[in-house]
Amino acid sequence: NNATSATGISQYYYHNNGKQLTEALHQSLNQLPLPNRGSDTAKYVVLDQVTRPATLLELGYINNPSDFKHIRTAVYQKEIANAVTAGLQSYFKQTMERK
């Protein structure tokens, strides 16, 4: 069934200034139990109308029973929070080192 076949984690950016942020988050999200489908450009409204670095994270699919089993747990939610925090720290560290 195509409606339930999408699985895993994806990261998207639109403007080039969001690529480094997206890649830093991509690296930290690799530790999560769901497969990381990678990062790509996408022309989503939430991305294309911003001027600051921006990324869209898809952290699992609620219509996929396997993904949903993870998404609904406090353990997975904490893993997501920790991974996103680590990715942001990495991004800002890289940004500060370039200055």
Positions of predicted regions on the chain:
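Active-site-proximal helix/loop segments of hydrolytic enzymes
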Residues: 1-99
